[in-house]
C-alpha cells in the first residue's frame, strides 16, 4: 500500500502526504509487532489518512544517543502514566497519535529498559510547543507529558522490547527517506525543462554532453527503483530481512539525489535550484 501510494503520488506530481510516518513506518511495524486489536484499531484508519501519526523519539539530552532517553512510563492500575519531554517532533500539532519511546524499566540497561507506546495526542497532560524557524514556519515541535495516562494495551511488543520495535521502524523509514519514485519524478521534471530551455538556439536536451550525463543518472535512478521493488518483495515475504537493503537504499538514494541536483545546477544554473 505504501509503495503504491508513493508511486501514484509521484506520477501525479502530488505534494507529500502528512500521514507518511504512519503509512510508511508505523503500519508495517504494527504488521510485524502489533496485536490483532492494534492492527484492527489503527491500520485501516492510518491508510485512509484518517489518523495522522508523529514520532516521539528525540529528547533534549537524547539525540544521537537515543537510548539515553529519560521520558518515563509507569504502569499504575492498568494504565501507563507518562512524564517527560520530546523534541524535534514533526507534525505533532496536526497529529492524532504518537508512537513514542518511553523508559519503563529504569533498573535495566538503557537499551533493554525502553518500551514502544502509542499515545493519543488529545490525552490530558500533553502540551505541544511549535519550534518556529526563521521563515516563521513550525515544522518541528516540543512535546511535554505531565502525568499523561494511556491504556496498558497501547504498548507494542512487550515491556522492554521498545528498542527492537524502534529498529523495525527505522528499517522501514530508511527505505521511505530515499524514495526512488520521488527521484524519478524529479528526473522527469528536469528532462521536460531541458526540452523547453535553449542555449544558443539549441534545446538543452539536444546538447550531447548534457544528454550523456542525463542518461547516466537515468540508469542509476531506474536501478534504484528496481532495488526498491526488491525490498518491497522482501517485506511481504516472511523471514526475509530488509534491514541491509534499506540501508543500501538510503545511502544510494541520498547520493543519487545529490548527483541529480548537481546535474540540474550544472545544466540550468540558478533555474536548476528551483526545478522541483
Task: Name what the model sees in each region.
Residues 1-11:
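Single conserved hydrophobic/aromatic residue that forms the stacking wall/gate
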Residues 15-37, 63:
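N-terminal glycine-rich flavin-associated loop
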Residues 71-74:
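A structural signal for short hydrophobic beta-strand segments in well-ordered beta-sheet cores
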Residues 126-226:
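Glycine-rich beta->alpha junctions and the first turn(s) of the following alpha-helix
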Residues 79, 83-129:
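A short core secondary-structure module
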Residues 49-57:
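A short, Trp-centered hydrophobic/proline-enriched beta-strand micro-motif
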Residues 62, 87-92, 134-135:
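Glycine-rich phosphate/pyrophosphate-binding beta-alpha loops
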Residues 199, 205-208, 222-276:
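C-terminal helix-coil-helix/basic helical segment that borders enzyme active sites and/or dimer interfaces
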Amino acid at each position: 500500500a505504501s509503495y503504491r501510494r508513493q508511486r501514484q503520488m509521484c506520477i501525479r506530481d502530488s505534494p507529500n502526504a502528512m500521514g507518511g510516518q504512519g503509512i510508511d513506518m508505523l503500519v508495517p511495524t504494527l504488521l510485524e509487532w502489533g496485536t490483532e486489536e492494534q492492527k484492527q484499531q489503527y491500520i485501516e484508519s492510518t491508510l485512509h489518512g484518517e489518523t495522522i501519526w508523529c514520532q516521539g523519539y528525540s529528547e533534549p539530552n537524547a539525540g544521537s544517543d537515543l537510548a539515553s532517553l529519560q521520558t518515563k512510563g509507569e504502569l499504575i492500575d492498568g494504565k501507563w502514566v507518562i512524564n517527560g519531554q520530546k523534541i524535534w517532533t514533526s507534525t505533532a500539532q496536526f497529529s492524532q497519535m504518537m508512537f513514542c519511546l518511553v523508559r519503563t524499566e529504569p533498573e535495566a540497561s538503557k537499551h533493554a529498559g525502553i518500551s514502544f507506546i502509542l499515545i493519543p495526542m488529545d490525552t490530558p497532560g500533553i502540551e505541544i510547543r511549535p519550534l518556529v524557524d526563521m521563515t516563521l514556519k513550525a515544522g518541528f515541535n516540543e512535546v511535554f507529558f505531565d502525568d499523561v495516562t494511556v491504556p496498558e494495551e497501547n504498548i507494542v511488543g512487550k515491556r522492554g522490547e521498545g528498542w527492537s520495535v524502534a529498529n523495525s521502524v527505522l528499517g522501514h523509514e530508511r527505505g521511505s527517506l530515499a524514495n526512488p519514485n520521488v527521484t524519478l519524478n524529479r528526473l522527469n521534471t528536469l528532462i521536460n525543462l531541458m526540452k523547453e530551455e535553449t542555449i544558443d538556439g539549441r534545446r538543452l536536451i539536444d546538447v550531447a554532453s548534457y544528454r550523456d550525463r542525463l542518461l547516466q543518472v537515468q540508469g542509476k535512478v531506474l536501478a534504484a527503483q528496481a532495488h526498491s521493488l526488491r525490498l518491497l518483495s522482501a517485506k511481504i515475504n516472511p523471514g526475509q530481512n530488509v534491514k541491509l537493503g534499506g540501508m543500501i537504499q538510503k545511502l544510494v538514494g541520498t547520493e543519487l539525489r545529490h548527483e541529480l541536483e548537481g546535474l540540474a545546477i550544472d545544466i540550468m544554473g540558478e533555474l536548476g535550484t528551483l526545478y522541483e
